[in-house]
Amino acid sequence: MGPQARTLCLLSLLLHVLPKPGKLVENSDFHLAGDYLLGGLFTLHANVKSISHLSYLQVPKCNEFTMKVLGYNLMQAMRFAVEEINNCSSLLPGVLLGYEMVDVCYLSNNIHPGLYFLAQDDDLLPILKDYSQYMPHVVAVIGPDNSESAITVSNILSHFLIPQITYSAISDKLRDKRHFPSMLRTVPSATHHIEAMVQLMVHFQWNWIVVLVSDDDYGRENSHLLSQRLTKTSDICIAFQEVLPIPESSQVMRSEEQRQLDNILDKLRRTSARVVVVFSPELSLYSFFHEVLRWNFTGFVWIASESWAIDPVLHNLTELRHTGTFLGVTIQRVSIPGFSQFRVRRDKPGYPVPNTTNLRTTCNQDCDACLNTTKSFNNILILSGERVVYSVYSAVYAVAHALHRLLGCNRVRCTKQKVYPWQLLREIWHVNFTLLGNRLFFDQQGDMPMLLDIIQWQWDLSQNPFQSIASYSPTSKRLTYINNVSWYTPNNTVPVSMCSKSCQPGQMKKSVGLHPCCFECLDCMPGTYLNRSADEFNCLSCPGSMWSYKNDITCFQRRPTFLEWHEVPTIVVAILAALGFFSTLAILFIFWRHFQTPMVRSAGGPMCFLMLVPLLLAFGMVPVYVGPPTVFSCFCRQAFFTVCFSICLSCITVRSFQIVCVFKMARRLPSAYSFWMRYHGPYVFVAFITAIKVALVVGNMLATTINPIGRTDPDDPNIMILSCHPNYRNGLLFNTSMDLLLSVLGFSFAYMGKELPTNYNEAKFITLSMTFSFTSSISLCTFMSVHDGVLVTIMDLLVTVLNFLAIGLGYFGPKCYMILFYPERNTSAYFNSMIQGYTMRKS
């Protein structure tokens, strides 16, 4: 025997064991004959602890429990909708709808009504192989109001695909159409209720809350959904969560329950949280709020779930206004014309009883106190806007529109025929109509995307006791604020419920304890910033080219600095470079015009041009030091200038060496001197030194890089120093060391030739040039080891220009002076006389 067969056998057995239908009560609100019957499940009475009778097989007597005003109000909404449809000529013309309604007394009476609706008129449930042609007692069921009851009834009705539309059960479990294929509802699911609550708390910046739940499926499931939702954001934390004790039906709490409740209230009094979210049926809260009043709580914000958000009995405890502000999530307010008058009407319409139905009664189809109790609450029910009433009203109309399509109705008549539940279910899934200005349809999960309202309790009965302050759309998942809230606080200020106050901009959070909402605020230091959307608990470092001040939330571009033309040091160096360029050009012209004269030949002859050309090019390339550095300018700084300078130094050094050889070594080592001159020793030496310098430069560039970079100014982090790569400094120091060696050699050879003939004695000029080069190079190395930034660039450029000026003016300047102003000394005879004089002194 399969699972379905076993279920059917069990249901059939229960139908035989449970009480049989009773005698028809003609003037009962629970019955109305019609061509097609709708079943209605409502909670007219409720037992807080509903498990006491489940240990034995007996249907409870609901009228022995506490009456629920809202339950009776919702049952009247179904009666009103059916009668309105029966009086409508455009919807189901010629067809009368009937109803059978049962009091399920919350959780106590679920199975029996389901079986009652499921059975045929003879109270039998035959075991069939195919139930597609089976006609139960009703074609559809409206209700019940809570998720636990709805799931129980749906587990019975879904086997037979009997449409069931609940008007208040919000459990997300009901969205699973594999287990509940015939379940639909006219309210949004619990997920949307939770989302509306969370957005409400986020809007008012409440991040420290208390959650109180009932000890049942409703409390556990909703608190679980809230916890899941809060894990997606660290904006809201739960200070603590407690389970409320459920008293017996007498509402008298036992000592154990009283101690449990006292512990909860004591924690609530000691906590800094001032927002309390309560997921519980309203019957479990009467004792709780009486205790809240006894403890004299004030200044709290109570957020009600939909189960008690508009409960008139709780609202009737007017002293609750002193405990704080009451907010709740409920279905949108839609006024139904004529319903308020219908609710307190006692007479029934005189519809003829069709022969197609056989009315009977079952247990819990009476409520003697309902009408009088409802009248006493009539004013508050009218002012509240009949919120959940519209959910029942629209559920009946959804069935009516589906039946209208199924029967092929036109404007004047319908084709009455047998209607099987599965046929009606198919049509209900596709209904799409407008009712009192609202477009109604069911989505893929069987939910009707109705708007939710955030309401506030008011105790001025001249106004709506459940004033709407905001609206939530399940479609857009956004909360729209429409009214200001009247806070029950001094000066009408928004209550504060925060474990820690919000950090100021640019302050990061440092967690204190286990809750992310409890933290201390720390300033973000300069060079860091806080991006709250990315990480509120860590200050992020600014990129290398950017900077920030203390407590900044963004970084800004550092101010780039480099050598610019308008700066005084640049202007001074540019003037010196221009002086060097034009003086070198003049020297080059003078030496070219007097190339054959003894003065030019004694200065080096062709080798002079080997020195002057690099000097001229070097002075012309000085502008590469100015402006933002580039790969080309860094290459010139690291390679071009040092090679030019090395060529000049090597030429001076070899010229000094050659003069000493002529006058002091030629006689002693004639063969060596002959070899030196025969194989162009001077040019070989210059080429050799140049090759070494080029090799050093190329090796340094290959080992490092010449790409320019931006570096932070150590004295001012707001400034970005644009310069060549730091390895450029290392290469510069290395190259300067080689130049120092050449300077020392040139100075030594010049000193050795200090006693030579006057026209060949260049010791003082070379000494001047080499000493200046040596001193400036030492100064540059010392300066670079101490300073950084643009100053190094300026110093490097200044030393480079001065070194070239020292060579150009210090070495060639005196010779040009002699050529231009003492031409008589620039003759072969004069030079020969000087050599003869030197020879005679040495002999």
Swiss-Prot record:
Q: Which residues lie on this side of the membrane: Extracellular?
A: 20-570, 628-642, 704-731, 786-789
Q: What is its main location?
A: membrane
Stretches assigned to the Cytoplasmic side: 592-606, 664-682, 753-764, 811-843
Which positions are glycosylated? 87, 296, 316, 355, 372, 432, 484, 491, 531
Keywords noted in UniProt: Cell membrane, G-protein coupled receptor, Glycoprotein, Membrane, Receptor, Sensory transduction, Signal, Taste, Transducer, Transmembrane, Transmembrane helix
Q: Which domain of life is it from?
A: Eukaryota
Checking Gene3D superfamilies in the record gives: 3.40.50.2300, GPCR, family 3, nine cysteines domain
Q: Which PROSITE patterns match?
A: G_PROTEIN_RECEP_F3_2 (PS00980), G_PROTEIN_RECEP_F3_4 (PS50259)
Per the record, GO CC terms?
A: membrane; plasma membrane; receptor complex; sweet taste receptor complex
- MF (Gene Ontology): G protein-coupled receptor activity; sweet taste receptor activity; taste receptor activity
Show the stretches that span the lipid bilayer: 571-591, 607-627, 643-663, 683-703, 732-752, 765-785, 790-810
Where does it live in the cell?
Answer: Cell membrane
Q: What's a BP term from Gene Ontology annotated to this protein? A: sensory perception of sweet taste
Q: Which residues form a coiled coil?
A: none
On tissue specificity, the annotation reads:
Abundantly expressed in circumvallate and foliate papillae.
Identify the stretch annotated as signal peptide in this record.
1-19
According to Swiss-Prot or TrEMBL, what is its membrane topology? Answer: Multi-pass membrane protein
User: Which family does the entry's similarity section mention?
Assistant: Belongs to the G-protein coupled receptor 3 family. TAS1R subfamily.
Function summary: Putative taste receptor. TAS1R2/TAS1R3 recognizes diverse natural and synthetic sweeteners.
According to the record's subunit comment, the protein's assembly and interactions are:
Forms heterodimers with TAS1R3.
Annotated protein name in UniProt: Taste receptor type 1 member 2
Gene symbol here is Tas1r2
